[in-house]
């Protein structure tokens, strides 16, 4: 879509669920996006250094959002000592 100046403008940019890989539709009002900031040794957020997770309403409705967030954070190296049934 273009505006009157000829610039490309999108009204909606679809996201993918970080846990399942499904596309989050525009009418999925149960979805959420969580941004976790990376911090320095003093505990202050580093500007521009963050990790974004998007969880679909399907994952949240199944009650799997906390487990999915733990799994994703472990994969990205944010968590280390979380119980895992595969171990």
Swiss-Prot record:
GO biological process terms on file: endonucleolytic cleavage in ITS1 to separate SSU-rRNA from 5.8S rRNA and LSU-rRNA from tricistronic rRNA transcript (SSU-rRNA, 5.8S rRNA, LSU-rRNA); endonucleolytic cleavage to generate mature 3'-end of SSU-rRNA from (SSU-rRNA, 5.8S rRNA, LSU-rRNA); translation
Entry keyword Lipoprotein: no
PROSITE patterns: RIBOSOMAL_S21E
UniProt superkingdom: Eukaryota
InterPro entries xref list: Ribosomal_eS21, Ribosomal_eS21_CS, Ribosomal_eS21_sf
Coiled coil (UniProt feature): none
Alphabetical keyword list: Cytoplasm, Ribonucleoprotein, Ribosomal protein, rRNA processing
Principal subcellular localisation of the protein: cytoplasm
Gene Ontology terms: cellular component: cytosolic small ribosomal subunit
Location in the cell: Cytoplasm
Pfam families attached to this UniProt entry: Ribosomal_S21e
Gene Ontology molecular functions: structural constituent of ribosome
Protein task: Component of the ribosome, a large ribonucleoprotein complex responsible for the synthesis of proteins in the cell. The small ribosomal subunit (SSU) binds messenger RNAs (mRNAs) and translates the encoded message by selecting cognate aminoacyl-transfer RNA (tRNA) molecules. The large subunit (LSU) contains the ribosomal catalytic site termed the peptidyl transferase center (PTC), which catalyzes the formation of peptide bonds, thereby polymerizing the amino acids delivered by tRNAs into a polypeptide chain.
Family, similarity comment: Belongs to the eukaryotic ribosomal protein eS21 family.
Subunit architecture: Component of the small ribosomal subunit (SSU). Mature N.crassa ribosomes consist of a small (40S) and a large (60S) subunit. The 40S small subunit contains 1 molecule of ribosomal RNA (18S rRNA) and at least 32 different proteins. The large 60S subunit contains 3 rRNA molecules (26S, 5.8S and 5S rRNA) and at least 42 different proteins.
Protein name from the UniProt record: Small ribosomal subunit protein eS21
Species: Neurospora crassa (strain ATCC 24698 / 74-OR23-1A / CBS 708.71 / DSM 1257 / FGSC 987)
């Amino acid at each position: 879509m273009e505006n009157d100046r000829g610039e490309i403008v999108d009204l909606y940019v679809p996201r993918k669920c970080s846990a399942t890989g499904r596309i989050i539709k525009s009418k999925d009002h149960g979805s959420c996006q969580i941004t976790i900031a990376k911090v320095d040794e003093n505990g202050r957020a580093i500007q521009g250094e963050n990790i974004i997770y998007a969880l679909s309403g399907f994952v949240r409705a199944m009650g799997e959002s906390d487990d999915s967030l733990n799994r994703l954070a472990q994969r990205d190296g944010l968590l280390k000592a979380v119980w895992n049934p595969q171990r």
